[in-house]
Amino acid sequence: RKHQKTEDERFLYWCDVKGMLVWSEMAAAYCYTDYAVEEFTKEWMEIVRQNYNHPCIITWTPMNESWGVSQIETRKVEQHFTEAVYYLTKSLDTMRPVIVNDGWEHTVSDIITLHDYEEVGDTLYKRYTEYKDQILTTEVYHSGKSALANGYEYKGQPIIISEYGGIAFNNDDSGWGYGNKVNTKEDFIKRFDDITTAVKKIPYCCGFCY
């Protein structure tokens, strides 16, 4: 997953050659405006047309975590915008799945993706097993977010945890990551194993991306 950027075609060429699978993504607009809608749509259509013939691309992902559509949970015009992007993408490519807003507050989507940076494996596993029915609704599932925007229902799509982990090392103040920082590579491997094992045990989870 080349996160929130459009890759140089040389990168995609070598992914074709080496057999690496890629999610094709897009940089976010800063906020929702008429101008952002026009420019985003134009640029995204160019991206799809330009990269359509790269077999390495397995899904189109134009938006992430409601960036650029920050009120999508309840605001109809932002929901309609994501629907328009979904169907425009489908009009150019009927084969690949489209994940319009990766992570949460989905409207129309071929895959339901969730982001969760929980650092304790047992907590992560229990969240997605004990509260499955609540998660796949418009109820909040984690960090104040819901899997679906208001007015939308889960329709049996595959479910992927497309962001998790993000473990930071305690090496300096500029280290980036989530949760408590680890001090050694052994600590990193232990936590990575703990949360990854938990994700793999979730019975309805079809895939994951660290």
Residue ranges and their predicted role:
Residues 1-210:
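Substrate-binding/catalytic cleft of secreted carbohydrate-active enzymes
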